[in-house]
Amino acid sequence: MHQHRRTSSAVASPVSSPHPSSSRPITRDRGTARFGPNVSRGLGIDRQMDASDQEQTIESPEKSPSQKLDQIIQNYHTKAALVILHSRVDLSPATYHGVIRTNKWFNVEVNETEDLKDSLGVWKYSNCTDSRPPPLIIEVYLDLTQLTNNQSLVIIDDSGKRWDVVEALATYGCLDNSRTSKSGVILERWRIDLGPGPDDLPLDMGSILPTVYKKSIVVFRSLYAYSKLLPAWKYSKRHSKIRPNPALSLKYRILQGPGGQIRSTNDPLTVPLHPGNGPVVDTYSFGVTDSPAGPLSALVTYRTNCDFRVDDSEALLSSRFMGVDERFFKPSLPSEDNFAAAGQEHGSLPVQKRDVGRPDLGQAYGSMSTFHQVGATTGASPISALRAARELAAGSPSSPTRPSHSPRPSQAGRVAALSGEGNHLIQRRPSISIQPFKAPPLSASPALVDSPVGSQPKNSAPRVGPMDITSSARQMPPPHGTPTTSRRSAHVSESAIASSTSGSPRPAPISKYSSSFSHRRGRLSSGGASKTDDDNNSSGRVSVSSSTVHPGSGTSADPATTSSGSLQADEDNISDFLKMLEMGKDLLSRKDSKSLDKNTKRTSAALSRFQKMRDSNAVLSDSMSSSLLLQPSSISSSKQLPNAATSVAGASISVSSSPGKAISPHTQHIPAVPSRLSSNSVVDYSHSHEDRHERRHRLSHESRRSPSEERANDEPRLKRDESTANAIDIPTSPRPFIPSFRRSSSAAQRRSSPPVEDDLGDFLPFGMRSLSLGAEDRSTLSLSELVRQQESSVPASDTNALQQQNQKDTRTGQSIVDESPSRIDNVPGTSSPRQYQPRFAHGRGRGSFGHPQPHVSAASSLGRASPIPNVTDADREGYIGSGNNGGTAVPPDTRRGSSHRFSFNRHLGTPANMDEDEPLLFAMSDFGASRRSLEEGRKGATTAGADHGGAPSTELQPAAETRSEGGPPSVSRGRYRAWP
């Protein structure tokens, strides 16, 4: 790049050469001497020159100014060709004695090559007077002749679409069928030109030539740099790193001016190869350098897009058949409605072809885990589908901007929404359908889509499904019995069921969404949980408070209550999550039953049936959970009754320490059930339904046994009751307003089962009683019970008078048989444990207790009792005055405080409704209607005396009573007379 310092040496005789540049005259002209040493380095033409010629001294023969001008013009063309082609193609270097020769003209060093000797001969031997050099045209192109029959050269446009280059050139007439005319695709065209000059050369060229040379240095430096910035250079470097197809290798050709170029009607360089708005070619000029022979210029015209590749012709043809490379093969997205931005399943079948009408969900039938209906299944659980159908039929207000769309089942196959965008037409999978049994039936219907984010229980069918929402979707290993928190909330028409931690193995909650709320699951709740908790912590049961639209349920919901600004263009996953939460608010509004049509009523009835079945499953789980949670606390906080000979049915009953709350069907209770590990602290569920008939039959014969014989028979029975306790009594579905109605209750309100009722009936003079009932609704005392009660305290002289009074009442009255349950007084919360005692003293050595404490605790855990058994005269003789309270009388005003009538009932015969004699676990506030219906039916029943020798019951009113010192009141002789 720098001029070499010349050293003086002996004058060497010039070597004869036919070329005019072979002789260098010796001159001291500084202007001409500067060009002398470099004249012999031109494209390897002077191969005969010795290496010593390169260090020729000033004393060599001097050239004329015209010869120096010819050298500048010749090297201007040849050096430009070397710079351009060295950056595009690989040229073989020229060597001399094993040394690569370098061309240093215009202070730019490039390697000499023998490849351009013949192509550049015209410009090497030209001069500015006799043979002016023609314009030098250099074209860089792609050779199409290198393509095979099954290959096509294509160009990729800015949008990534492929275009056939040969077809584009043929369209503009640049190619014909002859093989020789397929010159290729021109990428660049360089033009080096010497413009026209004066007829006569100026006389002072010696001072002008150094300026021309210096200006040319600037031009060649620009040419060297700019040639490496054009698209063709980038293309060549990209394909030089790999083994390219021969058709993709850059080729060049050197042409002489316009007259020497073979071209067709249209210029192949400017023909557009693909449609587009941008320019096809661009031009850059390196400026003009003035010289005595004329202006020297360099110009390049190049294609702006050089992204070429070779593809298989068959693949390119197939692409055209499919819509010219997906031009007409677009996803089936709606373009005429407001849901164009929402994600939808892509496929070759249009949406209209895949439309499936929604079947009538009200006509569907099946079990809790199967759902049979006409049409394709939507993957919904029965409860969620019925609930959604009822809510839609109720006429929820719809959004003014978006109509409610009917659901369409998603197609199992291609993933519906790869980015997790929600759509009203495509729903996510629901929570686990109800499985009341350990193993699901074989007909369990799988859902069509999956979630994302979450795990899948082992008993659920596999799902073909989309990926996740904002995270990679994947099948995670199912949980193995992980205890989780079950949450459920109360429906408007049902009382709340308290939630608790489940102690039984249960599938882990399925997370519908990967959100920041996932760490909040696992909390206990005393009441109904929110809908969000229910959805995020579902443990396998469909909750009452679940949203109207269950993901994947196939039932669309009304988006009226969603936020107004995110209904149309919101494609975010979190917005869909919030929309689903807002849609659930429709469940909080009460519906007018008059507005529901006939189909809606059938749907509601089916929904109620499923909800009752759900409660049976829920009560079992909650009871087991509560028994584990409440077992340690019940021992320390409750009052334990002695488990001795005076214990009730061989089990101790815990008494609540938090009285004062009325019993109501809408009261929340903490569930508790007996356990094998806690038989000493909870009521025993030990007797079956068949034992109840045996005990009732045995009651009629107990009056004829002696007290000692009766005690001997009771002891083994009590031991048997303790040893044969069942672990869990699974409750049945709730049936309102019948004696066998059972529901989940708190630990303090858990009542004994019917077998316990029979055992307590041995000494308790009354059955279960609803606290909400008034005293005036109590049943009257039967005659046989009054006889036994009074004979225990009335002397023999007064017995005859009482019997005569009873016989008189028998002729005029009728016995009233009351099998409905009644309630006993609360066990007083004293520090020492007490056994349960009847209100009035009677036989079998059990004293009465009658604390003057009214019924104030609705949460007290009290046992239910049946009517008292028959007592013989022998029992009465040794019985008078016995008991804890010494046979004292009980004032009637201490019993519920509002009535002087005592509630005694007795019926030793088999009741008419034996299938419905199971007592309530807790009394209901609205039991009055059922009570009155039972009273009406009681009038037509046979009297107890007709079957067992008793007399018809007669209502008696209490007379004066006495109170013994140190004990509660008791009934004394002659305290009862016929009620007027």
UniProtKB/Swiss-Prot annotation:
Residues 54-68, 553-567, 786-817 have a biased composition (Polar residues). Gene3D superfamilies: 6.10.140.1900, HORMA domain. Residues 1-68, 344-364, 391-415, 436-569, 654-763, 786-917, 931-980 are annotated as: Disordered. Residues 8-23, 396-410, 493-504, 538-549, 654-665, 738-753, 940-951 have a biased composition (Low complexity). Residues 700-723 have a biased composition (Basic and acidic residues). The keyword Iron does not apply. GO terms for biological process: mitophagy; piecemeal microautophagy of the nucleus; protein localization to phagophore assembly site; protein transport. It is found in: Cytoplasm; Preautophagosomal structure. GO terms for cellular component: Atg1/ULK1 kinase complex; cytosol; phagophore assembly site. Keywords: Autophagy, Cytoplasm, Protein transport, Transport. PANTHER family: AUTOPHAGY-RELATED PROTEIN 13, PTHR13430. Belongs to the ATG13 family. Fungi subfamily. Interacts with ATG1 to form the ATG1-ATG13 kinase complex. Activates the ATG1 kinase in a nutritional condition dependent manner through the TOR pathway, leading to autophagy. Also involved in cytoplasm to vacuole transport (Cvt) and more specifically in Cvt vesicle formation. Seems to play a role in the switching machinery regulating the conversion between the Cvt pathway and autophagy. Finally, ATG13 is also required for glycogen storage during stationary phase. This is Autophagy-related protein 13. It comes from Coccidioides immitis (strain RS). The gene is ATG13.
